[in-house]
Amino acid sequence: MAVWTRATKAGLVELLLRERWVRVVAELSGESLSLTGDAAAVEPEPPAAAFNGLPNGGGGESLPGSPNRGLGPPSPPAPPRGPAGEASASPPVRRVRVVKQEAGGLGISIKGGRENRMPILISKIFPGLAADQSRALRLGDAILSVNGTDLRQATHDQAVQALKRAGKEVLLEVKFIREVTPYIKKPSLVSDLPWEGASPQSPSFSGSEDSGSPKHQNTTKDRKVIPLKMCFAARNLSMPDLENRLIELHSPDSRNTLILRCKDTATAHSWFVAIHTNIMALLPQVLAELNAMLGATSTAGGSKEVKHIAWLAEQAKLDGGRQQWRPVLMAVTEKDLLLYDCMPWTRDAWASPCHSYPLVATRLVHSGSGCRSPSLGSDLTFATRTGSRQGIEMHLFRVETHRDLSTWTRILVQGCHAAAELIKEVSLGCTLSGQEVRFTVHYEHGFTITRDNGGASSILYRYPFERLKMSADDGIRNLYLDFGGPEGELTMDLHSCPKPIVFVLHTFLSAKVTRMGLLV
């Protein structure tokens, strides 16, 4: 396992939250990524906004520097309006009396107006000021009138002036409009950013403030802490990124995805490398925990030791011939290659992979390193082929960095060869020239074909690997071997697909050639 140096980093980024881009302060530590809401950035106010606590502008939907500018969804449509201009099918009109404070005014912000095809809406109530103390106003209230002045058809500026001239005592007619609340409510990292999948029993985090699922650690800040252990950091995976500014962080249980946007390509690359580095630095800890968990139940011949585990992307075929990359967790043990759709924290989960392939019947057939990494527009991929009873199963995987590609290439090649040395031999029954025989391939001794004679076996043929001149199969049930002997080509009916034994044969040969130093 390589030694990784953990990175620390901090700065402003944008987070996709409730289909809106909001600015957050990101802080990366060795074990977690903390996101803190930037209140001023989430709902920016124009510079001249201090008339009785009201913004003096067009509602803030497209202010310079706003995260929503040109990026978020369009302004919400106006609620259905009746003949009098009021929203239909909504709660009754309420009359609220508010006494302004000497400093701070009403203490509300408004959005909407006739030019925006919206009623005048209360979009923010400042804590501790007059509106908040009245306990009678709420976000999403439409202001219908101020001291008798009708605001149903008022522009935003007209509403601002009416509230400004209202005097110390203000009588408001308001009506709550539920449909617009999601558009004006400030997104909350604590309540609106779902994130689960941390280890349910993780010794390494048991005494850390970053343990478990993300949480609200400071009552005065909108903050969430994302444990990085077994997360998947990716680029250009689940969301198009034409500007190369996005970073995806997938939870260990694959249920949630966090999308971050940086100011430019270079910043995004820097953040991605730092996050990815810290995730990879936690892998030795994960391997130790997994092997400790599995060691309690593994048998002497179980070979359950996990050699490597990490997230990558697998190419999946969709309807219509389309293809899509999707996250997949790959684990390599002493004998098997395992694929999961989420992190198996428990023994039961570990015992139920989506796919399991014997390494001795698997080989790496492609490992391509493009001139650039996925974060810069080119894919780094490798492919595996496994001989199974159904034929050849092929998987194409994508990694995020050149180092990942190198690691997986080495792990798979060395893992297949080590599995060959560990397993030593494979034996199966078949039919040769009309008689039932047993065909055995031994890593050291080569090929043996025996026949059972009433409890005792007799050797029909025995050849070392170097005598093999040709091997072939029909992909259905027959295996053809030619050792250059007087018997000529041997045709063995395996009664099932010959691909598993063919792949085992090739793995044995590759491992022996590598051991002899003839193949690096």
From Swiss-Prot:
Family matches, as Pfam families: PDZ, PH, PH_17, Syntrophin_4th
Sorted UniProt keywords: Actin-binding, Calcium, Calmodulin-binding, Cell junction, Cytoplasm, Cytoplasmic vesicle, Cytoskeleton, Membrane, Microtubule, Phosphoprotein, Repeat
Post-translational modification: Phosphorylated. Partially dephosphorylated upon insulin stimulation.
UniProt feature, compositional bias: Low complexity: 63-72, 83-93, 197-211
Subcellular location: Membrane; Cytoplasmic vesicle, Secretory vesicle membrane; Cell junction; Cytoplasm, Cytoskeleton
Domain PH: 143-280, 305-417
CDD domains per UniProt: PDZ_syntrophin-like, PHsplit_syntrophin
Region spans: Calmodulin-binding: 498-520
Biased composition (Pro residues): 73-82
Family to which the UniProt record says this protein belongs: Belongs to the syntrophin family.
Name of the protein described by the UniProt record: Beta-2-syntrophin
